Amino acid sequence: MFATELTGKTVMTEDGQILGVLSDFMVETKTGKIQSILVDPAETVERRLFKTDPEGRLILSFRSMKAVRDVIVTQLAD
């Protein structure tokens, strides 16, 4: 699956909480590896609980992604 196919997919937690929609990626320039995903948050998400970029998008670790199908499932740190 290509990164462009992931953009626009809904991102949710393992317990079904919708976090928002994947809008972009943060890439390590030296290695080209995806470090983080940027998520346009759903209205119900408390942004203060997450690390955000200057545009208010949630910054989630790429490694936290658990499954990708119709939606992207991510694991939140405890």
Could you say what each language-model-derived stretch is?
Residues 1-78:
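Peripheral interaction segments used for macromolecular assembly
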